[in-house]
Amino acid sequence: MTESTAKVQVIGGGLAGTEAAWQVAQAGIPVILHEMRPIRTSPAHHSQELAELVCSNSFGAMSSNRAAGLLHEELRRLNSIIIQTADKHAVPAGGALAVDRGVFSHQLTQTLQNHPLIELRRSEVQEIPSDGIVILATGPLTSPVLAEKLQQFTGMAYMSFFDAASPIIVGDSINRDIAFLASRYDKGEAAYLNCPLNPEQYLQFRDELCTAEQAELKEFERETAKFFEGCLPIEELAQRGEDTMRYGPLKPVGLFDARLGDFRDPENKEKRPYAVVQLRQEDKQGKLWNMVGFQTNLKWGEQKRVFRLIPGLENAEFVRMGVMHRNTFINSPQLLDPTLQFKSRPTLLAAGQLIGTEGYTAASAGGWLAGTNAARIALGLEPISLPSTTMMGALFEFISSASPKHFQPMPPNFGILPDLPVRIRNKRERYGKYRDRALADLNDCQTQLNNHQKNSVILV
């Protein structure tokens, strides 16, 4: 098979690329899957198998009442090869879908190699193919040569090589009796939620930050992190001095709770906060809030413990923890449509961690949609996007519509789904309703698509 006879090329043999190539081939379209290993290795991989799980062997919670579990179920219903293989090789892991990673990756490699329409090509791709239908699924450790070409294609401002992200919190879990909505000096629209701290609260918070247990950067991440002096972990700022945070991300000047009066009134001077943690709106609906300046290397359990000491966040529900690690990803809101096509070149698609989704299952979901749409383009059909009420649809709607200025990778979570018609306070019941709506709407979507393409096997 050559590039001219193959209708689609997939670059990258991780979870996203494996899923994408399978969906293209299952639609009857010849595909070349490029994987650079073992010709060129990465610091994180240990084998030449496709879909190697380089970190945990877990795909997250199995229950469809959980965000990851709902995404599993959606992919299961869409005939995902990744989830089918994970189900087949699952190992006991409590409530999580975990796999025997060696057997899992080996079977996927054999399955794709044996497909008559898939050619697995072991070579490093150093250029983005200039024509034809192409899916980029090169992952967080994209080779330096291809990363440079991708950076040239997208523009310098639209590539990130180190993921320094603050935690993201569900808005409903923030105590609005304490947190107040305001912008500094009342300039412009009140765009931030602000959590005020008095001196005692601030010093306790700083002490806990300084002694909290940190996660170690991997060896290959340390060099990249050296260039990030301008984006230091919050615990590093805390250790540099008692007031360092108060003159940095926790700066209180110009922030005052209007419920307490006019901050310009000298009589209210004693009411002004000693320090302020600011939360910035993360999505259009205002359901998710980002802790401004709180990129961190703390272990996840420590983040929850320490950050819940902040007044107003005592019951905070985290949908994403703060991270600092090597992660090549593009600015998807600037570059991609919800179909995962590049706006500037609709025959070029992308999937996986490269587009700013987080986690194994989300990478597989991106591979499914990119592969499905690449096949549809090859067949002369319109690309699809899934309903925003599904976890898949909501995730790709988010990464293609979030603020480009503040875009950071996002895992699947219920906070990105549209509100239910009726507010439900019980979390378990609310998540169950999200699940029921998502699966019903996914079923309707499949039915409608199949009615319009009787001869296609993309969706069954």
Curated annotation (Swiss-Prot):
Q: Which range is the signal sequence, renumbered to this chain? A: none
Q: Which UniProt keywords apply?
A: Cytoplasm, FAD, Flavoprotein, Methyltransferase, NAD, NADP, Transferase, tRNA processing
Q: Which GO terms describe its cellular component?
A: cytosol
Residues holding FAD: G12, G13, G14, L15, A16, G17
Q: What protein name is recorded for this chain?
A: Methylenetetrahydrofolate--tRNA-(uracil-5-)-methyltransferase TrmFO
Q: Describe the task this protein carries out.
A: Catalyzes the folate-dependent formation of 5-methyl-uridine at position 54 (M-5-U54) in all tRNAs.
Major subcellular site: cytoplasm
Q: Which Pfam families match?
A: GIDA
Q: Which gene encodes it?
A: trmFO
Localization, per the record, is: Cytoplasm
Cofactor(s), by name = FAD
Reactions mediated catalytically: uridine(54) in tRNA + (6R)-5,10-methylene-5,6,7,8-tetrahydrofolate + NADH + H(+) = 5-methyluridine(54) in tRNA + (6S)-5,6,7,8-tetrahydrofolate + NAD(+); uridine(54) in tRNA + (6R)-5,10-methylene-5,6,7,8-tetrahydrofolate + NADPH + H(+) = 5-methyluridine(54) in tRNA + (6S)-5,6,7,8-tetrahydrofolate + NADP(+)
